[in-house]
């Protein structure tokens, strides 16, 4: 405990386990330094390069600032009270089952991020990720770009504000989905079985069977609401220009 590390290089596994009150600066984890920090509390990592996967698990009180993950596969699992500022990460299953996260300036290349995460705020970020935010709760994303199919399935309380989203069959099976001033580009079969309150800038390619709520957009290329699957009276669709497709009752 109470360790400060500056300009260090880790080349082998498990360098910091079961530690407390750690500060690292200008430090490098090489490829074989896998599973570098587990079961550690109160740790700040600044201006570091991390080449090894499976880092940062079951940590509490973690701050990552200006950190680059060349291989972030299965990184940041089951951590609580996490702050991320200006982080670049490449790898699948980033931040699974984390709680109480505050993120600003994350650039992520990797699928299945934030699966099962809770109480997360994300700002000014770019996520290129399939299956992002699955099974998550209480997520708010602001001023960010998200691209990847099946966004947000089985989530609860997902809020997107001032975001640009590209997602095949995205935003489905969600309880309490909110979109404010968002753009949906190349997004088809959206909102299936979701309870949604969406204010969309521009058009949506297609919407399929939202369960309830209100969707406002400039236009919807194809709107499908099937009365044998959902109750059309529970969803209000407002198109500023044009709604198209079948079952589009309730357009105004």
Where do the protein language model's features map onto the residues?
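Long, distal/terminal scaffolding or interaction modules
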Residues: 1-252
